[in-house]
Amino acid sequence: MSTPDAQAAALHAPVLAQRCVDLLAPALESDGAVLVDATLGMGGHSELVLEQCPHARVLGIDRDPRALELATARLARFGQRFTPVHAVYDEIDDVARQHAGGAVQGVLFDLGVSSLQLDDAGRGFAYAQDAPLDMRMDPTTGPTAADLLADADEAELRRILRTYGEEKFAPRIAAAIVRRREAAPLRRSSDLVEVVRGAIPMSAQRTGGHPAKRTFQALRIAVNRELEVLERALPRAIDALAVGGRIVVESYHSLEDRLVKRELARGATSSAPRHLPVVPEEDQPYLELLTHGAEQADDVELAANPRAASVRLRAARRIRTTPTRPSPRRRRP
């Protein structure tokens, strides 16, 4: 592990880490209890769980080989209580079967791009740093952001920007990208920032932060198929929970939080018609919500960790088993 990586791990403050542990800990008290950290990153959340829940072991999933290497070194002192797994988190059911016999006591998702990826100028995630337009969370597989910008037609670019970036100037930006690539390909983040700045009216650039923020978010989500992966992962994670197990999800924009809210609410609501005098067992809720709406970072957390500003945390507990539901077709992003 390089010195810069070691420094990054030491400085990285996981968001709402203690709150996550407090929510998960009641399910991790028995010997051999298993937590799946589905978004391992630099291992900050897992480290706190392993320190405060001495009977638990952690399966740490990440699609980024560099993050796995970094977290494995950080958590080496816990020995066999920590197992790194190179996978995408919609493979959580397979990971649970292979490493925990199918049922786990806790699942944690800390969604979005990690500090490691944001702070590495060479990955192309940050609009404030010039770098090749890559944006892949796993840099060993799949098309890059530059590939997407070169291959997608104007309508598809418009859809990506509007859907994943909630960008109201999506038509103007998509048209500008197509015009620019006819002259020269967009290969670097500075190329894309220049196009976005030229497409958005100056009056709109004076508010709302960096004008390319939403475009970069949209491309990152599209390149990594983040919402598709999350939509598959959430029901699989819930199905992998043993009764009494807990799931905690931290999301960082409304698109993620909407999916999380919907999936947890579905599990916490009866599926029976309202007029039935008795709710059949198979229609009874299988989750109990542990948070009232989405929790946010308080002033103390924000002062220590500004990246917590957009976090929305939701949690639930598995209260009964559910009939086996059909598994959506898996497609590796």
Swiss-Prot record:
Cellular component aspect of the GO annotation: cytoplasm
Q: What is its main location?
A: cytoplasm
Quote the catalytic activity from the record: cytidine(1402) in 16S rRNA + S-adenosyl-L-methionine = N(4)-methylcytidine(1402) in 16S rRNA + S-adenosyl-L-homocysteine + H(+)
Which residues are involved in binding S-adenosyl-L-methionine?
Answer: G43, G44, H45, D62, Y89, D110, Q117
What does the UniProt keyword field contain?
Cytoplasm, Methyltransferase, rRNA processing, S-adenosyl-L-methionine, Transferase
List the Pfam families hit by this protein, alphabetically: Methyltransf_5
Q: What is its EC number?
A: 2.1.1.199
Q: What Gene Ontology molecular-function terms does this entry list?
A: rRNA (cytosine-N4-)-methyltransferase activity
Q: Where in the cell is it found?
A: Cytoplasm
Which InterPro entries is this protein grouped with? RsmH, SAM-dep_MeTrfase_MraW_recog, SAM-dependent_MTases_sf
Does the record bear Cell wall biogenesis/degradation in its keywords? no
Query: Per the record, which residues fall in region Disordered?
Result: 312-333
Q: Which GO terms describe its biological process?
A: rRNA base methylation
Is ATP-binding one of the keywords? no
The organism's place on the tree of life at top rank: Bacteria
Q: Which Gene3D superfamilies match?
A: Putative methyltransferase TM0872, insert domain, Vaccinia Virus protein VP39
Return the similarity comment. Belongs to the methyltransferase superfamily. RsmH family.
Looking up PANTHER family in the UniProt record yields: 12S RRNA N4-METHYLCYTIDINE METHYLTRANSFERASE, S-ADENOSYL-METHYLTRANSFERASE MRAW
Q: What does this protein do?
A: Specifically methylates the N4 position of cytidine in position 1402 (C1402) of 16S rRNA.
Q: What is the protein name given in its UniProt record?
A: Ribosomal RNA small subunit methyltransferase H
